Curated annotation (Swiss-Prot):
Catalytic reaction annotation: CMP + ATP = CDP + ADP; dCMP + ATP = dCDP + ADP; UMP + ATP = UDP + ADP
Coiled coil location: none
Any one Gene Ontology molecular-function term assigned to this protein's record: dCMP kinase activity
Organism of provenance: Arabidopsis thaliana (Mouse-ear cress)
Subcellular location: Cytoplasm; Nucleus
Protein known as: Probable UMP-CMP kinase 1
Binding site for CMP: 112
Cofactor-binding details, from the entry: Binds 1 Mg(2+) ion per monomer.
Function: Catalyzes the phosphorylation of pyrimidine nucleoside monophosphates at the expense of ATP. Plays an important role in de novo pyrimidine nucleotide biosynthesis. Has preference for UMP and CMP as phosphate acceptors.
Length: 204
């Protein structure tokens, strides 16, 4: 069965170049509450939410060759190659029928950003960063018991190390361009969403 990454010809599988699409990247350490807050934004502001992690896990469940490779990488706390993640995101956006997207957990490094911009031809309207201390992130992940293979303390620490080394430079990049919107994610979910709500009401 063909997957989004089987493409022999890049041009045939590029994202549509929507001129009026609004894309918001949502970044934060593992356990920072990105998914919960994205669901709130979807409810109140009519965005379509895509989690890079959820799309990768769906590919794993499909039983494809790439799914097995993704599973191994996630278990080791490594970042999946950009081409795979971007093509999964492009396919999801193309099938959504919407033109307002929250992309959660992406880009995770400079390569992700370059591949997305080159394929999708879209720059984010802004980048939402949920800032939260490592100790709080570990506590949240260990207490949520979602049955995910990547929710054990060693893998959590690996994921946070990857986040610090690879994603914080991306956050600095967007901050230098005036596109970063930082939220204190150590507060309660309700307090965090109030800050998010005010932000989206002013930005969109």
């Amino acid at each position: 069965m063909e997957t989004p990454i089987d493409a022999p010809n890049k041009d045939e599988h590029e994202c549509p170049r929507w001129k009026k699409s609004t894309v918001v990247f949502v970044l934060g350490g593992p356990g920072s509450g990105k998914g919960t807050q994205c669901a709130n934004v979807v409810k109140h502001f009519s965005y379509t939410h895509f989690s890079a992690g959820d799309l990768l896990r769906a590919e794993i469940k499909s039983g494809s060759e790439f799914g097995a490779m993704i599973q191994s990488m996630i278990a080791e706390g490594r970042i999946v190659p950009s081409e795979i993640t971007v093509k999964l995101l492009c396919k999801a956006m193309e099938e959504s029928g919407n033109d307002k997207f929250l992309i959660d957990g992406f880009p995770r490094n400079e390569e992700n950003r370059n591949v997305f911009e080159n394929v999708a031809r879209i720059e984010p309207a802004f980048v939402l960063f949920f800032d939260c201390p490592e100790e709080e992130l570990e506590r949240r992940i260990m207490s949520r018991n979602q049955g995910r293979e990547d929710d054990n303390i060693e893998t959590i620490k690996k994921r946070f190390k990857v986040f610090v080394e690879s994603t914080l430079p991306i956050i600095s990049y967007y901050e230098s361009k005036g596109k970063l919107r930082k939220i204190n994610a150590a507060k309660s979910s309700e307090e965090v969403f109030e800050a998010v709500r005010v932000l989206f009401a002013s930005e969109t």
